[in-house]
Amino acid sequence: MTVRQKKTWSDRFEGSLHPAIVEFNASITFDIELIEYDLTGSIAHAKMLAKTGIISEAEAQKLVNGLEQIRQEYRDGNFTPGIDQEDVHFAVERRLTELVGDVGKKLHTARSRNDQVGTDIRLYLRDQIQQIRSQIQAFQQVLLTHAQENVETLIPGYTHLQRAQPISLAHHLLAYFQMAQRDWERLGEIYQRTNVSPLGCGALAGTTFPIDRHYSAELLGFEEVYGNSLDGVSDRDFAIEFLNAASLIMVHLSRLSEEMILWASQEFGFISLTDSCATGSSIMPQKKNPDVPELVRGKAGRVFGHLQGMLVLMKGLPLAYNKDLQEDKEAIFDGVKTVKGCLEAMTVLLGEGITFRKERLSEAVAEDFSNATDVADYLAAKGVPFREAYNLVGKVVKTSLASGKLLKDLTLEEWQALHPNFEADIYDAIAPKQVVAARNSYGGTGFEQIYQAVERAKQQLELS
């Protein structure tokens, strides 16, 4: 069936648009996400038109009332435009004209869909950035709570996924806190570059009407306006920057997820999953699966794909606006939804879904040679060149492995046979708690440093 719904631009054309092209061209199925922002932007535009005398105050009030009625209809579920409306902007304008008559046709004076959609996306993303930043803080708070409770809980630290040195569990958790802090700060910087108004740039070259762009920007809470209309309608740097920041958030969540998956396995056994945040198997009744971190790890690739897609979308576009830019919205919308969903899920998982198995952690830091570096440090502190000490300890580890002993199991005679500088205090030096406490350099895992790091983290949350 041929679609005969009249388009705002259709008087230039003869006949009707092919139904397949109507469907292909339409964005209403996804850009309806912008409707609240489109209405807000249009209200500001109507007020600006009245302020500058382009329309009367009475006309502006009719437009504002009509737009607010559409907002209520949408919230009540009574405004559900179909693909014949093409996009959210045309759908709103058509409904507005139905509500207020011909004055509705004046709303688009001194405005193009090009600057209109750019305004909508910025308003949308501005809100979403603030919401995500709040979610990051909630995530950080859960990490901080665990850190405060586990300053002196020890856990193996790894390099190459091989046990390296024991560390404070709080130190490990605070590493993710700092990653999240950078994410929070990065989004704040992107917010500033998003908070610039393109409204009034027109299709590409501005307008002949005596508009006041700074006034409409002020009404919408924008801090600046674009100084070049071509740039204003074609810029999507802010969206790419957001997806880049979103990708980094997902990198951090995915890394933590990978560790949660490993730690929940029988091979590690560092955490237990609560029933509220784990699932079972359809065939193996003994299973408790870490679906939440697995899904977060998987969804990271989805956000990375949106970033790559946006870069490829933009790389070949000549100035100014091109229909290709319709493809930016689904990437932005899904990127936002995915990041928010993953942040919420991981916050719940950390807050309610895991229990640290402290007995197992204590065993893990005492059952290997992760205190070997401290033996080398012990000798170096007694004047033995570090590299010489390092080589000696390597031989000690090799000998101990062959005899089935850990370093703590060697007798003092065995130690002194290896080097005369070993004394009885070697056992204190290689005890797990002392190994951790001794690393008291700024930013290290020493308990004194971790207590200070916890306080700094508290202050960061309080100031943000």
UniProtKB/Swiss-Prot annotation:
Q: Which keywords fit this entry according to its UniProt record?
A: Amino-acid biosynthesis, Arginine biosynthesis, Cytoplasm, Lyase
Q: Which is a Pfam family this sequence falls into?
A: ASL_C2
| InterPro entries, A to Z | Arg_succ_lyase_C, Argininosuccinate_lyase, Fumarase/histidase_N, Fumarate_lyase_CS, Fumarate_lyase_fam, Fumarate_lyase_N, L-Aspartase-like
Its name, as the record gives it, is Argininosuccinate lyase
Q: Name the chemical reaction catalysed here.
A: 2-(N(omega)-L-arginino)succinate = fumarate + L-arginine
**Where does this chain mainly localize?**
cytoplasm
Source species: Crocosphaera subtropica (strain ATCC 51142 / BH68) (Cyanothece sp. (strain ATCC 51142))
List, alphabetically, the SUPFAM superfamilies matched. Answer: L-aspartase-like
Where is this protein localized, as stated in its record? Cytoplasm
* Pathway participation: Amino-acid biosynthesis; L-arginine biosynthesis; L-arginine from L-ornithine and carbamoyl phosphate: step 3/3
HAMAP family (alphabetical): Arg_succ_lyase
EC number assigned by the record = 4.3.2.1
Cellular compartments per GO CC: cytosol
Q: What class of enzyme is it?
A: lyase
Q: What is an annotated GO biological process for this record, any one? A: L-arginine biosynthetic process
Q: Does the keyword Lipid biosynthesis apply?
A: no
Q: Name one GO molecular function term.
A: argininosuccinate lyase activity
- Report the sequence similarity comment from the record: Belongs to the lyase 1 family. Argininosuccinate lyase subfamily.
